[in-house]
Amino acid sequence: MGQVFLLMPVLLVAGYLSLGAAMENQRLFNIAVNRVQHLHLLAQKMFNDFEGTLLPDERRQLNKIFLLDFCNSDSIVSPIDKHETQKSSVLKLLHISFRLIESWEYPSQTLTHTMSNNLNQNQMSEKLSNLKVGINLLIKGNQEDVPSLDDNDSQQLLPYGNYYQNLGDNDNVRRNYELLACFKKDMHKVETYLTVAKCRKSLEANCTL
């Protein structure tokens, strides 16, 4: 009986620590999701504003080209549909999100030059950098869920090439269109992955997309 009473304070402390860690994890998830939602909305606005400067025929032609082309981030292995996203582990979704955000740190310098808005290069880079730091904290805090990455997960960490800079200056309209379309596409991906990961770590019973 005495041993039981001695263990009770230890168990209570452990419980409080576990609860505190879970609350901090949710706080970080909330911040990360809010930040990527902001970036996704920003990407959508930038893309729509750019499309608004194009002629209808020009817009249709660029859309056809983009559907047949690819984004540089397509080399980062990620779930191809909602079903795969639902099956992916929290840690896998976090690693993919980190890699996608990281892949835009350099192209974002060009991204801000394509638009005449109030967002400067440093602000865009700062938004991406802050989100990357937050996702990295979440990865460290959730390492215990999956001790190590499997072979498929490790493919996401391949070096990132600067595809967008190689499109050339002779076709700036196409280059800017693809840049903005890919940025919007990737921010949507990250928003989806972080939202699913956040739900998995919460008490919500239904995390379907």
Swiss-Prot record:
GO biological process: animal organ development; growth hormone receptor signaling pathway; positive regulation of growth; positive regulation of receptor signaling pathway via JAK-STAT; response to nutrient levels
Main localization, broad class: secreted
GO molecular function: growth hormone activity; growth hormone receptor binding; metal ion binding
SUPFAM superfamilies attached to this UniProt entry: 4-helical cytokines (SSF47266)
Residues holding Zn(2+): H38, E191
Pfam families linked: Hormone_1
Entry-linked PROSITE patterns: SOMATOTROPIN_1, SOMATOTROPIN_2
InterPro entries: 4_helix_cytokine-like_core (IPR009079), Somatotropin (IPR034975), Somatotropin/Prolactin (IPR001400), Somatotropin_CS (IPR018116)
Gene3D superfamilies noted in UniProt: 1.20.1250.10
Keywords, comma-separated and alphabetical: Disulfide bond, Hormone, Metal-binding, Secreted, Signal, Zinc
Range of residues in the leader sequence: 1-22
Compartment(s): Secreted
Disulfides per UniProt: C71-C182, C199-C207
GO cellular component: extracellular space
Family, per entry: Belongs to the somatotropin/prolactin family.
Biological function: Growth hormone plays an important role in growth control and is involved in the regulation of several anabolic processes. Implicated as an osmoregulatory substance important for seawater adaptation.
Name listed for the protein in its UniProt record: Somatotropin
